[in-house]
Amino acid sequence: MPAAEFDLIVIGAGPGGVAAADTAALLGKRVALVERTAAIGGAAVNTGTIPSKTLRETALAISGVKARALFGVDVSVRREAKVEDLLRHERLVTASESHQMRTLLDRYGVAVYRGTGTFLDPNTVRVAHPSPPGGVTDLRADKIVVAIGSVPMRPAVFPFESPRVHDSDELLYITAIPRSLAVIGAGVIGSEYACMFAALGVRVHLIDGRDALLPFLDPDLSNALKDAMEKQGIVFWWKDQVEACTAPRSGEIELRLASGNELAVDNVLVCAGRTSAAATLAPERAGFGVTPRGLIPVDEHFRTTVPHIYAVGDVIGFPALASTSAEQGRVAACHAFGSHAKEALAQFLPAGIYTIPEVSSVGLTEAQAKDKGIAVVVGRADYDQNPRGKIIGDKTGFLKLVFAREDLKLLGVHVIGEQASELVHIGLIAMMTGGDANLFLATCFNYPTLGDLYKLATHDAILKRAELVGKAQVGLSRW
């Protein structure tokens, strides 16, 4: 049977793949989307971003954490949370998001093929269908986008055959909330899950080979988050690693650490990074290669070494975020078909970390600016100085703005606290438009809102700058 002809084949229906498919379809192209699982959305929607953030909100709701912060007392009624309570809302949100993405693909006329895609040659992809067994469909296109995402790494030291030893994908299938949990890896995923389970009253041990929490963050945010996590009861094991893990059928799982310490816990969650399965695509038949980590090298347009084959998302490595993957997919599709609608990634890419408390940032940290030789002034506003912050009971959150000292142009925004991942967008848009301190002073924010923190932090920066440059008074138009 001859191959079905398309303008574009996309392999992988995560954020990057769906964005590429939708964009090409909107450009009037015939698009085929290949997805090995039954659900559209990839890891972001089905096992990663959306599920974990939904679980976080559920954990906060049923644990009474927010109520304790607001009223200063424990007003929670339910003392024992069941795993069904934790997962019910997650299942609904995940299914709804996946369905919505599929509905849009159908509306755009994208042909979706269920199965595993492999290259037969640089322009042909064979789809092996799960049902009926042995069924295949060959697809052919002038342009191809690879967006197969990533999978959790599984270090050999951990017995994943045990139902109580999980990677970050499998955690969604736990059958009971453990009394104690060891989280291996204090990266973004490990830290988020550690906070979530600690909120539910689980004794959490967080083990990491580094000596600092999320060192890519502004140090003030990293230190504040570490303090908050320790107050939740999370125990950190820094500069350490697991050398042995024994998981009997019953009883506690035993961990032996390189430091000589031993831990006994109910469950283990391994968050040791993610890797790609790009080698399973038979890339050699298409003419491009992969790195030892399974990543696909690309240029600034997300082209592989084969000019008509693109790769986006986790399969190309950092930053491996759902938001940036979608951006990459749009850029790749536009470049493939000569459209100028989206020629490059956004200049500034925000990061959101859904720990408890939430953390978000965009742009330069104070240290990064200084490394670039830029003299800076930093303004800070604490949530407990803001009426909205007081109303919601957030006593530890803060907003930190990094300005260029010379002209007070905004260079970076760093937030920790309630709604941090939303609040950062005010600064993000200001940076996208080249905004400076005057923008925030000229803006009228609703009252009371956390957005007003921008005005307070800007005042702080202006006063500090006045002290630095020796001015007793600073006029509104003379920054």
What would you call each of these model-derived segments?
Residues 9-37, 43, 50, 54-61, ...:
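Flexible, glycine-rich terminal cap/loop adjacent to redox cofactors
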Residues 161-178, 262-340, 422, 426, ...:
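FAD-site-proximal beta/loop scaffold in flavoenzymes
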Residues 16-23, 43, 165, 190-193, ...:
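Short glycine/serine/threonine-rich phosphate/pyrophosphate-binding segments
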